[in-house]
C-alpha cells in the first residue's frame, strides 16, 4: 500500500513538496470521482489542509525550517482517518448559525460538496481498502534503492481504482527520479563528481500491454512525460511486452493510438523480437519510419533469441541474445 495522504520529500523546499503533493491529490480525486468539478476540488483541498493542520503535520503557512515530509509513515492520516475528519467537519458546519439566506445557501452548498467527497472515499474504503486505505508499507520509501510494485491484477479492477493505483505508483517513481536526478545533475555540472559516479535511476515495467490502452489514459500520459523527461535527470524507462497487438487493440480511439505512437517515438532504443506476420501493420503504426520495409518483413521470420534493435538517429542492428543454462534456470516466466 502507498498512502495517498503521505507527503513525500520531492524537493529540498518543503513548500514545494506540499504544492506537488496537493497537485497529485487533485488528480487522484478527479480519477476517483470520475468527473472534473472545480468547486469540489477546492472543498477537497480545503478539508485536506485543515486535517493536516489539526494533526500538526502542516502549519497554516509553511516557513523555511518547517518539516512536513519527515514524519514516520504511521503518522500521516489514511483514507479512514480522512473519512472521520470529513464527517466531523460536516457536523461542525451544521452547528453554525448563518446570519443571512445567502450565508445559509453557501453552507448548504459546502455540505453537499463534502457529502459527495465523503461518499467517494467511503466507497473506496469499503470496496478497495486493501489497495488504498492504510499507511505506506515501506518507511522512508524515497530512500530505498530498489522497490518492486506488484500490479499483476490491476487490470481486473474498475478503471477509477486501477488508474489511481497506477498514478500513485508512477508518481512515486517520477518524483524519486527527479529528486535524485537534480542532485546528481548539480554535482556533475559543478564538476564535483564524474559521470561514472552519477547515481542513475531506472524504472522497468514488465507486461506493459496490460495498461497500454485507452482504459489508462492518466498512466499513458505519465509514461510519455517520463520517457521524454527522465533522460534529463539521469533516468531511464524500460517497457516490455511480448505482443504489439495488445498495445494497440481493435477499436482503439485515435487519441489513444496517438499517445502510444508518441510514447514509442520518445524511446531511443527499441528491441523487436518475432511477431506474427498479421501484426506487421500494427508495428508500422507504432514504429513508423524507424524501421525499413525490409526490416518489417524480416520480423515474422526472426528466430528464437534474435532481435532487431532500432536506434533513434542511427542505423538498426539485428543481433542474437545468448543465454547461459544458469540464466535459463533463473528464469521463472514460463516453460
Language-model regions, residue ranges each:
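P-loop NTPase motor domains
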Residues: 2-235, 307-311
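Conserved ATP-driven motor cores of ASCE-family P-loop NTPases powering translocation/secretion/packaging/pilus
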Residues: 3-35, 218-322
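Short helix/loop capping segments that flank catalytic or ligand/cofactor-binding pockets
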Residues: 157-159, 213, 281, 318-320, ...
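Short, solvent-exposed amphipathic alpha-helical segments in soluble enzyme
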Residues: 164-168, 287-288, 326
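C-terminal alpha-helical "lid" subdomain
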Residues: 322-335
Amino acid at each position: 500500500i502507498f498512502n495517498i495522504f503521505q507527503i513525500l520529500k520531492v524537493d529540498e523546499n518543503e513548500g514545494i513538496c506540499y504544492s506537488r503533493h496537493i497537485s497529485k491529490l487533485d488528480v487522484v480525486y478527479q480519477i476517483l470521482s470520475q468527473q472534473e468539478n472545480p468547486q469540489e476540488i477546492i472543498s477537497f483541498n480545503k478539508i485536506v489542509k485543515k486535517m493536516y493542520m489539526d494533526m500538526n503535520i502542516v502549519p497554516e503557512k509553511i516557513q523555511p525550517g518547517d518539516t512536513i515530509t519527515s514524519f514516520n509513515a504511521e503518522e500521516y492520516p489514511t483514507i479512514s482517518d480522512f473519512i472521520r475528519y470529513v464527517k466531523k467537519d460536516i457536523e461542525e458546519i451544521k452547528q453554525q448559525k448563518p446570519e443571512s439566506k445567502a450565508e445559509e445557501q453557501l453552507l448548504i452548498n459546502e455540505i453537499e460538496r463534502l457529502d459527495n467527497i465523503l461518499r467517494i472515499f467511503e466507497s473506496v474504503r469499503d470496496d478497495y481498502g486493501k489497495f488504498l486505505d492504510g499507511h505506506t508499507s515501506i518507511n522512508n520509501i524515497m530512500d530505498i534503492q530498489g522497490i518492486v510494485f506488484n500490479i499483476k491484477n490491476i487490470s481486473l479492477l474498475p478503471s477509477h481504482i486501477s488508474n489511481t493505483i497506477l498514478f500513485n505508483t508512477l508518481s512515486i517513481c517520477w518524483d524519486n527520479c527527479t529528486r535524485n536526478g537534480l542532485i546528481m545533475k548539480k554535482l556533475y555540472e559543478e564538476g564535483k563528481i564524474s559521470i561514472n559516479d552519477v547515481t542513475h535511476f531506472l524504472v522497468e515495467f514488465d507486461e506493459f500491454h496490460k495498461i497500454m490502452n485507452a482504459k489508462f489514459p492518466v498512466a499513458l500520459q505519465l509514461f510519455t512525460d517520463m520517457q521524454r523527461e527522465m533522460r534529463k535527470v539521469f533516468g531511464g524507462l524500460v517497457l516490455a511486452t511480448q505482443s504489439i497487438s495488445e498495445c494497440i487493440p481493435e477499436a482503439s480511439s485515435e487519441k489513444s493510438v496517438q499517445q502510444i505512437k508518441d510514447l514509442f517515438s520518445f524511446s531511443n532504443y527499441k528491441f523487436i523480437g518475432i511477431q506474427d506476420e498479421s501484426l506487421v501493420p500494427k508495428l508500422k503504426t507504432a514504429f513508423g519510419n524507424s524501421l525499413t520495409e525490409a526490416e518489417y518483413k524480416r520480423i515474422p521470420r526472426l528466430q528464437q533469441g534474435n532481435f532487431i534493435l532500432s536506434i533513434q538517429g542511427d542505423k538498426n542492428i539485428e543481433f542474437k541474445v545468448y543465454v547461459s543454462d544458469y540464466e535459463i534456470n533463473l528464469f521463472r516466466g514460463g516453460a
